[in-house]
Amino acid sequence: KATQGANGRWSFTPAGDWADGQYTLTVKVEDEAGNIRQSAPLTVTVDTQTAIDGIELVNDHGISGDNLTNALRPEFRVTTPGDVNTVRLSLDGDTNWVNATKNAAGVWEYNWPGDVGEGKHTLTVEATDAAGNTATRTLEFTIDTTLSVPVITLDSADDSGNRGDNVTSVRSPGFTIENIDPDANRVTVQIAHDGSSREVELTQTGGRWHFTPDSAWTDGSYTLTVKVEDNAGNIRYSTPLDVKVDTHTSINRIELVNDNGVPDDNLTNEMRPQFRVTVPEDVTVVRLSLDGSGDWVNATAGATKGEWNYSWSSDVGEGKHVLTVEVTDAAGNTATKTLDFRIDTRLSEPVITLNSADDTGVPGDGLTSRAQPSFTLQGIDADVVRVTVSVEHGGRTETFDVLQGAGGWIFTPAAAWTDGSYTLKVTVEDEAGNIRHSAPLDVKVDTQTAIDRIELVNDSG
């Protein structure tokens, strides 16, 4: 019931506190004559409080909702009741407040215009509604832009070639990953090989980060890159590591360079043999041993890649020998191959004689009346591969190849010789390239004689 004051005004005050909400008030008046009138209804809203429903770090990178970001200029979103008309923010107790802006969806937003330093921060948000009520709420957040660059290396035990060359003969090599920060939440290794790539997620074991392929790699080149991500969403990549897997090597060829005589028969008349070894270009060491002696000598790389040479520094004896070659490549792989060869420096000196049947003069005087005399060749070794007879006559020399017949080594001119002097010499060559010459044989062909004159000595008349 309303009451009239001393000034004649009527007023109404509730006897008790009203709860928040909407109220409709209507005034009813009645005079002494019994007339009654009612006012138009008055709707009143009682609003004694407001709230801040949520504060969100918009650029919360990494793990969602952990209020950890790597953005130096954080962005915030504030959710409030619809009747809030002012939202302002303050950082780390600063008395300088900034006003958020309400978007079309009724959410308040603010992007910090300047860089906020690394570390922990406290955001204070104050909201004011249409009734003048205020509410305050804080948000703890952290800015972290720091993450170390990881490093990946081939395990020294698997670096089987020259130390640090990242060439290995191990098909499942191990790799050590270092410089991983404690707040890293994901570590992966990206492996590129032969035009394709894959990513493997790692787990820290025994306080260390390590990677070993789960299956054997084929020979070839591999590029490994470590990717690290922390709780704040920072990402770092290691410098790519190029690794070559090489699990075998070979010896392509062993050549006896001074192979005289028949080519490639590995027979020589040189007491100091020379060898050429052809190998893959990644071979770094070539060594040789003779007849299983266990004494090794190192070959020297030639001007042509993949060719190695060695000339024996002292005489090697006559006969058969076995050369053993061992090679080692950059990955530490080894290969062994042998070459059987023979040294032969001996060859008998041939002898040529005029056949006795054609020695028509005094035996052994080298004088014959035969225009096509035959000659016997002796002292011809079994390993001889070529026999020639050179015939010099009248300032001209001709050479003829001789073949062994059923009757032995015989040389007979193919055409009749004219009368005159002839010098014959035999040359023999064996499989090892040894050459010997006979002593010259001088022969005179005289196929006719004459009676120049008959004289009666005691012709006295």
Which role does the model predict for each range below?
Residues 15-22, 112-120, 213-221, 312-320, ...:
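Surface-exposed, short loops/turns at beta-strand junctions within beta-sandwich domains
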Residues 37-60, 137-155, 237-259, 337-355, ...:
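Flexible, low-complexity linkers/stalks enriched in Thr/Pro that connect modular domains
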Residues 80-85, 179-185, 279-284, 380-385:
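Short proline/glycine-enriched turn/loop motifs at strand-loop junctions of beta-rich domains
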